[in-house]
Amino acid sequence: MKKGLITSILALTFTGLQAQPLPATPKLVVTLTIDQLRTDYMEAFSSLYGEKGFKRLMREGKVFYQTEFPFSGTDRASAIAAIYSGTTPSMNGIISQQWMNANTLRPMNCVDDPAFMGNFTDESSSPSQLLTSTIADELKVATRNKGMVYAIAPSRDAAILAAGHSGNGAFWLNENTGKWCSTTYYSEFPWWVSQYNERQSPDFRIRDMVWEPIHPINRYTFLPEWRDQPFKYKFDSERINK
């Protein structure tokens, strides 16, 4: 009797599993990494978000409120390496944005690599210091190298570490010229990026840009200490990082 009951349950279980269609494989995967965006800010400013942005992600996605990595003293580079590889600096090798080169006794960037030239930059870069696989690399493996992986960021360490070892391209802003640049480690520099640099790069438009809150200051109810300090910044100087 017990044997028959167990067999019936298993049969029903397998039947139910077979009846469920497999989820469709996503054709596009987008990863956004925003430096200094704390989880409590996501909730505090939720009333200001559009319906198709953060609100949709929080409503339809999976939110992890207490995710931690077991290491301290993080900076941008070590944090991005940890997020994209799922490992700590002791495993992925990215202990900081910069460290002392044991051979030259001079500071070096975590993506410095003299073996490769830069495109629209004098900096030589590659992900050679990254010792582990990343989600971008695993996507390449899963698609048998048919997937396309690109990373775009304001800084080169963020772009290169996000693109991983097998990405198709990594692009970041040259802080001196305002043009998008890359490294010869990846495939040939796309013609459309060169065209954009020559016609529409931020360097041509930044003087007309104004950085200020998108909403009236009184709508930012969770920042009472800033309400008496209206923020407005123009990019019309010749300074680096303008």
Question: PLM features: residue spans?
Answer:
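Bacterial Sec-dependent N-terminal signal peptides
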Residues: 1-24
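Beta-strand elements within well-structured catalytic alpha/beta cores of enzymes
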Residues: 26-38, 57, 83, 139
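Acidic/histidine-rich, surface-exposed loop or edge segments in extracytoplasmic proteins
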Residues: 30-40, 116-120, 242
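Second-shell loop/turn segments in exported
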Residues: 38-44, 68-70, 121-127
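Extracytoplasmic/secreted cell-surface and envelope-processing proteins
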Residues: 39-43, 76, 159-163
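Short, structured active-site-proximal loop/turn typified by the sulfatase FGly-forming signature C/S-X-P-X-R
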Residues: 42-91, 148-152
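His/Asp/Glu-rich, glycine-adjacent segments
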Residues: 96-242
